[in-house]
Amino acid sequence: AQSSTGGFDILNLRWKNREGFKPLYYFLTRTRPNQRSTYFLLIKKKDRDRAIMKLDVTIPSYFKAQIEPKNIRFAYCEAGSVSSRTKCGETIPASISLNNDGKLIEIVPTSPVPTDRTIGVELQVRNPYGRGMYQFNALAQSPGEVTLAKYLGSWVIELKGGG
């Protein structure tokens, strides 16, 4: 996982060692509280081994920000590096809904998404007030499987203090 600050985070190092925990790459355009930000929650092709017919993103209950379905996009993306920024391009046709009082994003593509490219959920959101760490989780269902969702990994997002 990587934040827009690019700094090393000791908690990320600790979480990486937890059995069953898998950090996923993300990028935020702004990390200060109460600022408008774009969240790029990426699932790289190396992070999944099967096509996706449904993707669920769980949001912690203490993440006090308003997320609207119209501000959510599912797309093919490219992770940034030192010389390029993270960006999402071609939109993947999908039905996107919010459930569980806005704490579950359900994405159902019109056809299963193959494993050959990095995909991402792009959110336009106003960051919650105050600093904190928020663990968003990715769960996916694949074609032909029992309807149980498989854990793909987590984005541990840190918002810095100050205003």
Which role fits each region the language model picked out?
Residues Q2-S4:
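Boundary of Sec targeting at the N-terminus
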Residues I10, W15-E19, T38-I43:
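Intrinsically disordered, low-complexity regulatory regions in eukaryotic proteins
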Residues K16-F27, T31-P33:
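N-terminal edge beta-strand
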Residues R32-A51:
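Short beta-strand elements of extracellular/lumenal beta-sandwich folds
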Residues I43, R48, V125-G163:
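Helix-rich interaction surfaces within compact, conserved domain-sized segments
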Residues I52-K87:
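Solvent-exposed beta-hairpin/edge-strand motifs
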Residues V82-D116:
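Extended, solvent-exposed segments with strong compositional bias
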Residues S111-G130:
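Low-complexity, intrinsically disordered segments enriched in Ser/Thr together with acidic residues
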